[in-house]
A protein has these predicted regions:
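Metal-dependent phosphoesterase/phosphodiesterase active-site architecture
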Residues: 41-148, 153-161, 170, 174, ...
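Well-ordered, non-membrane alpha-helical segments in soluble/globular domains
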Residues: 9-13, 128, 169
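Soluble non-cytosolic domains of exported or imported proteins
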Residues: 5-9, 120-124, 166-167
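Core catalytic region of metal-dependent phosphoesterases/phosphodiesterases
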Residues: 1-40, 178
Length: 359
């Protein structure tokens, strides 16, 4: 809603109307992202978001921002990545004119160059909660799978979108490795991308996007076979990241980075904040794109045909002494760029499998 700051209530109304048929028939368990952060809307800009969802308690000073819940033997963990990302991508006034809030609010104009940057707002409380939650799950025999959802991406090779963020890699990927997170679901970039299982990282494998000097990006390290056609995985050896950003957008971003020297997949990475700087026109401001590049050795599959699609997951809890599986089918809509009711086609199917815990 922060893209339409003078009409935020109407945007939320329209969003709810669009979703009500689905939400009336299945639970909607959201996570906040950069576009939920609005000026004049509470300390993290999330009051409109929090007012519209009743979410599980997290026992911290920040209710509703992050939470967990269990379905069968799957633990779902929902996070607010704005707390840890370097990218400044929330509410912003680019100028040259100030942003004038709706008259009914009585709020003063917001000057050009102002951005609502909330990195670090929980002072580590979210990360401490996450570690407690994952540690408990790792020792709970009733939990076979850990699935994390967040808005921003630790692993994205989008060329025209945002890219990857080192802040997530620093704060949370070590915890995902330590406690065996199986799957991470993200959005932010409006496309589809699947990683190989990753664990650990390669150091100083990135370069500055402008100077070419070596920089630290904490490049995620793939484990196992790097066959892009492989469809079955044991996630006890590494975490798979999925970008599912094609559920509905007017700006599909199905264009991906490529290293011009090698032809390999390439990713942009934010390794530091991109706070507003003066633009070329008087009294205007811009936020720079990601500052670093790395070879996306972790990228297994990218959908270059369309930015639109949906993922469907099926969980089989298995039988005692056997295996349990999660099957993901991604359906894309190649004609959606021209027709709003394009037919969905199966793009790929993957199966995650592991030995079921003894109950």
């Amino acid at each position: 809603a922060n893209l339409n700051p003078a009409h935020q209530p109407e945007v939320w109304r329209d969003f709810g109307n669009n979703n009500q048929t689905s939400a009336a028939n299945r639970p909607w368990m959201p996570c906040p992202g950069n576009h939920e952060i609005e000026f004049n809307n509470g300390p993290q800009g999330l009051d409109s978001y929090l007012a519209r969802y009743t979410l599980p308690e997290n026992g911290t000073h920040f209710p509703g921002r992050w939470y967990s819940f269990r379905v069968s033997s799957v633990l779902f963990v929902s996070l607010d990545a704005d707390d840890v990302v370097y990218q400044d991508a929330a509410a912003f006034v680019g100028g040259p004119a100030p942003l004038v809030p709706a008259a009914s609010t009585g709020r003063p104009p917001i000057e050009p160059g102002t951005s609502f940057y909330v990195r670090g707002y929980s002072n580590g409380e979210q990360t401490r909660w996450l570690e407690r939650t994952l540690r408990h799950a790792a020792h709970d025999d009733d939990i076979d799978w850990i699935v994390v959802q967040m808005h921003q991406d630790a692993l994205s090779s989008s060329k025209t979108g945002n890219g990857s963020d080192k802040g997530i890699r620093e704060a949370w990927l070590p915890l995902f490795d330590r406690y065996g997170v199986d799957l991470v679901l993200c959005g932010h970039d409006h496309d589809y991308e699947r990683s190989y299982p990753v664990r650990g990282c390669n150091h100083r494998a990135g370069v500055d996007a402008k100077t070419g000097e070596v920089v630290e990006t904490l490049q995620p390290r793939p484990v196992g076979s790097n066959d892009p056609d492989r469809t079955k995985f044991d996630t006890s050896h590494g975490t798979i990241h999925l970008i599912l950003g094609g559920g509905g957008t007017s700006a599909p971003l199905d264009v991906y980075g490529e290293n011009p020297s090698t032809g390999f997949a390439q990713a942009k990475v934010f390794t530091k904040p991109n706070r507003p700087v003066p633009g070329t026109a008087p009294n205007t401001f811009v936020r720079q794109p990601a500052d670093a590049l790395e070879d996306a050795i972790w990228s297994a599959r990218r959908d270059t045909g369309t930015g639109y699609g949906i993922a469907v997951f099926d969980h089989d809890p298995g039988k005692p002494g056997g295996h349990t599986t999660i099957t993901m089918r991604y359906y894309h809509a190649p004609g959606a760029d021209q027709h709003p009711t394009a037919q969905y086609e199966l793009f790929e199917t993957i199966e995650l499998s592991k030995k079921r815990r003894e109950r």
